[in-house]
């Protein structure tokens, strides 16, 4: 794989994340059926506010994700390690959340995002570009 292609994949992953965040934050159940959306909004209102630890972890994951993408774009070995750690921590923080309901658009975007994450991990560890990360600059 060429470096330019890998960099385009990094950009596509970043653009997808920028598209997903506003959808999840501001329009969480916009495409869900009316009864389900109403029930989930009521469920969300009954839940206590996220504790400080979870909020800090989510912010650290977001910052770590952006930094790791930048370092991967520059073919830095620390970016490769950080990307793996951030995605591993994000996986476990998803389990700390209660019920999660996806509408069809969120489901598709999350699936594409997961494919990108797996594809990037495969490229940075198992392709011929993995040697580029090990070079000292």
Per-region residue spans from a language model:
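Topology signature of small-to-medium multi-pass alpha-helical membrane proteins
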Residues: 1-137
């Amino acid at each position: 794989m060429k470096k330019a292609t890998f960099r385009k994949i990094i950009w596509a992953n970043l653009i997808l994340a920028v598209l997903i965040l506003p959808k999840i934050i501001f329009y969480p159940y916009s495409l869900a059926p009316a009864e389900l959306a109403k029930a989930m909004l009521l469920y969300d209102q009954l839940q206590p506010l996220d504790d400080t630890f979870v909020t800090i972890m989510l912010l650290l994951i977001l910052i770590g994700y952006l930094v790791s993408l930048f370092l991967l774009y520059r073919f830095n070995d620390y970016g490769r390690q950080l990307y793996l750690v951030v995605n591993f921590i994000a996986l476990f923080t998803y389990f700390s959340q209660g019920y999660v309901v996806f509408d069809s658009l969120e489901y598709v975007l999350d699936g594409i995002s997961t494919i990108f994450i797996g594809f990037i991990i495969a490229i940075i560890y198992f392709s011929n570009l993995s040697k580029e990360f090990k070079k000292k600059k």
